[in-house]
Structure formats: structure tokens, C-alpha cells
Amino acid sequence: MKKFLYTMIAGASLALAACNSQPQSTDMASQKKDIGLQLYSIRQLIGNAETFATNGDSILARLAGMGYTCVEAANYGNGKLYGMDPEAYKACVEKAGLKSLSTHTTRGLSEEELKAGAASEETMKWWDECIAAHKAAGVEYIVTPWQNLPKTLEELKLWCEYHNAIGKKCAEAGIKYGYHNHAHEFKKVEDQVMLAYMIENTDPQYVFFELDVYWTVMGQASPVEYFKKYPGRFKLLHIKDHKEIGQSGMVGFDAIFKNAEVAGVEHIIVEAEAYECADMMDGVKLCADYLLNADFVKACYSK
């Protein structure tokens, strides 16, 4: 515990020092890497329709200037992203020199559907509209960001069948479908670890996993062990730390990236939920700088 606290304090001190230091001049051309940002990381700035309309152009341009190449959306509803028609969202992102790569959105199964043992026709129609909107937005990956811990293994099996059905619909539209973990997926449902069961009971043809490396560590599991046990299942990675990336010492990023090929990684996406930096855009830049300057991070992972 003392070692953990020391590491956290030391990491926080380094992050604060980096936030307060003068920006270093870097040759972005020589350090160009394919790095995405989950826009939830800056939700206070462009987290909804109103703030995106006000700040979207300037914030996205700043992200491109930091070295980010693509974004993952986190605000979809009623056929729109951040209150915009899909085509308008795509144009806004591309105007900044970024790519509309992926999104976090989902519709869960209701208690009635769980009791019935199947998703309703209304739910699957919702997915048809969702997929069509994201196709128009140029999105390549749709990711379900959350699912509660099921009460029984039978319920978890139903969720896996649901993910397969969504994934099949996405595949028919030329979009890849995945699931993003937090820490609770490493708990057991009856005698099965939730995430392991999900990986083993979803069709690789239709469902991939976006492993959040920080939440995996917080769930007392090893990202690298999951890569080796389930090779090729992790097309996206959420690169996350306690705060700014690389500052806590909690996550073994070098080993994670050295095993990215085994995992099947196609893109890496930064997500930050809290910052040492007073200005979150400074924190987002620190995350990009860490990855741009890390020798163990390749320029591109997509095939």
C-alpha cells in the first residue's frame, strides 16, 4: 500500500510539473502516429449539442494540432451525434483534419426483455437507425460502453446473444461492433469471470472488444494475459491511466504495446476521466505527447 501511494504521489508531482512547464517544440511530421481521443475526455468542453455547437470547431482543431488523428464520439441520440445530423458531424470532424473513427453508444436490454429471453423488435429497430446514422457519419466502429453485472449466467448468455445480433447487423452495414469494459467485468457471475465468458461466447466475426487497459488493471487483471489468452479479439484499445497517461506508474504501457499485435489491435484511443492539469486540454496534450514520444508505440496499428 505504501509503495502504491508513493507511486501515485510521485506520478501526480510529475504531471503537475509537466502541466506547468513550457510547451516543447516538436517536429510533428517526424512523430506522426495514429492516435484517437475519446471525446468523453473533454465532455465539459464539447459534451453535448450546445457546447459542441459553440466549441466544436476550435477544440477539434486544437486536438489535431496536438497530434491526434481521429476521434471516438460519446453523444448519440435520435439519429444525431452531438445534436448534429451524421453528415454534419462527419464534416465538422474532417474539417479539423481528423477522422470520425468510432463511437460509444448502446441500448440495453430491459427487465421485460431479459424475462422474455430476447430483445424486442423495437430494440432491434433502434439499432437499425443507430447503425444507419453512424454509417452516414463515417464511423467504422460502434462500441457498447457499459453493461451491468448480470445476476445469473443465463442472463449473461442472453447478453452475449444480443451482442452477436447487434454485431451481425453492424457487419452487414460494413461497421465493426465491440464492447468496452470497466472493472466490474472481472467479477464472477456464478463461477465465470464476466469478461472471459463474454469473449468466449461471442462470435469473433461479429464482436470485438475494446479493452480499457486502466479498468482492466483496476479489476486486478492483466491486459497482456488477456491478449495472449484471446489473441486477435481486441481491435481497439482504450489507453488510460489514473489521470494523465504515463504519470501514475500503475499501468505497464510498454508491455501492453509490445503485445498489441497479438491482441489484434487496429487503433489506440486515449481516454482520460480526470486530470492533474488545471486545464484539461493541457492534460489531453500530455497524453498525446507521452504516446508520440514513446518508442514502444508504433506509428500505425491498422492493417
Give residue spans per PLM region.
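Positively charged n-region of N-terminal signal peptides that target proteins for export
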Residues: 1-4
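N-terminal pre-domain/capping segments
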Residues: 6-7, 19-140, 289, 293-303
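Bacterial N-terminal signal peptides
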Residues: 7-15
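Acidic/histidine-rich catalytic cores of soluble enzymes
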Residues: 30, 70-71, 171-257
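Hydrophobic faces of well-ordered beta-strands that scaffold small-molecule active sites
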Residues: 33-39, 71-73, 100-105, 142-144, ...
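Acidic-and-aromatic substrate-binding clefts and catalytic sites of carbohydrate-active enzymes
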Residues: 43-52, 73-85, 107-124, 148-157, ...
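Active-site acidic/histidine proton-transfer and metal-coordination neighborhood
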Residues: 99, 111-208, 281, 301-302
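Aromatic-rich peripheral "rim/lid" segments of glycoside hydrolase catalytic domains that contact
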Residues: 259, 273-303
